[in-house]
């Protein structure tokens, strides 16, 4: 998916890969910092609730990038963080009457289950924000020492005016910056952003030279990038909603601290419904367990990965079912070849498939190659040309493997992936219902109703029976607790 005429020329990078860099606004040759090695940092989840399909799109999109780089023989270090301390986590845990750390750990497991259900490879490391407080404090101290940060009323702020080129990633003019943090009495300038929040009653806090408190959102990723990938690395990735303020503020801190930081910035588009970003606040989310009641995990993965990663993916039931049919066509062909010809081992992808992925991960074009091979293979199989059919089947396995949804891969064939995902969700629902039962026992009806309503938003219906609560996915299977 090229954006400029010169992007159509053959790749000249040693990897053969060209990627769209948000910083430059162009498709550029990807040349790793270290020959044969690629370092990637993906902004992961803020673990405040059950994951919906909008949350996991970045995981699927950049899993394809990782698989393609690995297939090219590169050693990939892939880091995906977990934000386990945040205002929303603290507020939701308090509303439910649960410890904040337990709340975060529970939904971290929910995200892990969702990624696993969709065949996303586990990261090389998955650091939690709370495990890197020391590194954050050290980073903030460096920023204060260099004159880029200051303390105020127990908080610590980054002084945006000290960086003349602030806003270069997002295109924001420094005079027009609005951080969306609200009014803070300790700020010298409302354009500044928070690095550290002073301690508040009832909230977790850690000791620092400027008093107890907890980290701001933008600091954790810079500290963890440094800890796992060094002062300079190849690719920083995330959803396009993170360009500003999160990634802009990461760049500000890293450069102010003297780091080279990321050499490429990659951002995936949203999953939308009715033209709006999928968001709990808008009430237009589709939880992973709810969708997996209607389609298999491999089919959902195919659907989420079928659009170009930078494009918006407008969800519709028709589009989802079209993806199911397309995936079934590939699956049926491979099964036919295996039944009539023999074992199908992955072969070689086609040159057009490779060219598509080398052109900024143009998955729609790559999938067109898959279906072209399927059409050739089906005709060959029907005419008795088993050799051609097998060649096409082996090529399809190679291509679908890069896309993470090879129908003959053992992860899809050796288990009922939907049942596995539902089993993971069952653990989480039981935890929520235990919290609801505790609230009911202390006659806290508002909290009990809130937990039930949140489950319903995630596509989970709770029914109170004489034998205890029973939960079910809306229009799906039910389970006793």
Curated annotation (Swiss-Prot):
Annotated protein name in UniProt: Cysteine--tRNA ligase
Listed cofactors: Zn(2+)
SMART domains, per database record: DALR_2
Record: residues binding ATP: 280
Keyword Secreted: no
Compartment list: Cytoplasm
InterPro entries the record matches: Cys-tRNA-ligase, Cys-tRNA-synt_Ia_DALR, Cys-tRNA/MSH_ligase, CysS_C, Rossmann-like_a/b/a_fold, tRNA-synt_1_cat_dom, tRNAsynth_Ia_anticodon-bd
Family under the similarity heading: Belongs to the class-I aminoacyl-tRNA synthetase family.
GO cellular component assignments: cytosol
Reaction it catalyzes: tRNA(Cys) + L-cysteine + ATP = L-cysteinyl-tRNA(Cys) + AMP + diphosphate
Organism: Mycobacterium sp. (strain JLS)
């Amino acid at each position: 998916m090229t954006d400029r005429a010169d992007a159509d020329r053959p790749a000249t990078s040693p990897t053969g890969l060209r990627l769209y860099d948000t910083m430059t606004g162009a498709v550029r040759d990807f040349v790793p910092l270290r020959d044969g090695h690629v370092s990637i940092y993906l902004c992961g989840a803020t673990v405040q609730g059950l994951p919906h399909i909008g949350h996991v799109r970045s995981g699927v999109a950049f899993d394809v990038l990782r698989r393609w780089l690995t297939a090219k023989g590169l050693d990939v270090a892939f880091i995906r963080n977990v934000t386990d301390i945040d205002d929303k986590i603290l507020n939701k845990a308090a509303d439910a009457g649960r410890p904040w750390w337990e709340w975060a750990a529970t939904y971290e497991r929910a995200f892990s289950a969702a990624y696993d259900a969709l065949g996303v490879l586990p990261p090389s490391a998955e650091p939690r924000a709370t495990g890197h407080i020391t590194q954050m404090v050290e980073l903030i101290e460096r920023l204060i020492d260099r004159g880029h940060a200051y303390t105020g009323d127990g908080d610590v702020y980054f002084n945006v005016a000290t960086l003349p080129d602030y806003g270069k990633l997002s295109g924001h003019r420094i005079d027009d910056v609005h951080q969306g943090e609200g009014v803070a009495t300790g700020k010298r300038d409302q354009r500044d952003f928070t690095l550290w929040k002073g301690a508040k009653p009832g909230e977790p806090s850690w000791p620092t030279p400027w008093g107890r408190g907890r980290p701001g959102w933008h600091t954790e990723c810079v500290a963890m990038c440094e800890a796992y990938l060094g002062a300079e690395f190849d690719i920083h990735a995330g959803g396009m909603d993170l360009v500003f303020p999160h990634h802009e503020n990461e760049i500000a801190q890293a450069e102010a601290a003297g780091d080279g930081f990321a050499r490429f910035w990659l951002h995936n588009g949203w999953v939308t419904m009715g033209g709006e970003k999928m968001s709990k606040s808008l009430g237009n989310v589709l939880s992973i367990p709810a969708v997996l009641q209607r389609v298999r995990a491999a089919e959902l993965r195919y659907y989420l990965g079928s659009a170009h990663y930078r494009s918006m993916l407008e969800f519709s039931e028709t589009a989802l079912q079209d993806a199911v049919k397309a995936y079934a066509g590939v699956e049926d062909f491979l099964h036919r070849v295996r039944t009539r010809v023999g074992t199908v081992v992955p072969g070689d992808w086609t040159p057009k498939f490779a060219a598509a992925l080398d052109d900024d991960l143009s998955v729609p074009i790559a999938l067109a190659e898959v279906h072209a091979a399927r059409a050739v293979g089906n005709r060959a199989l029907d005419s008795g040309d088993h050799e051609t059919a097998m060649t096409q089947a082996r090529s399809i396995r190679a291509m679908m493997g890069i896309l993470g949804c090879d129908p003959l891969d053992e992860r899809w064939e050796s288990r009922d992936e939907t049942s596995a995902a539902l089993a993971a969700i069952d653990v989480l629902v039981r935890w929520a219902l235990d919290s609801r039962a505790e609230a009911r026992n202390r006659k806290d009806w508002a909290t009990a109703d809130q937990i039930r309503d949140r489950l319903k938003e995630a596509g989970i219906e709770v029914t109170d029976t004489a034998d205890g609560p029973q939960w079910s996915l809306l229009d799906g299977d039910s389970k006793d607790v």
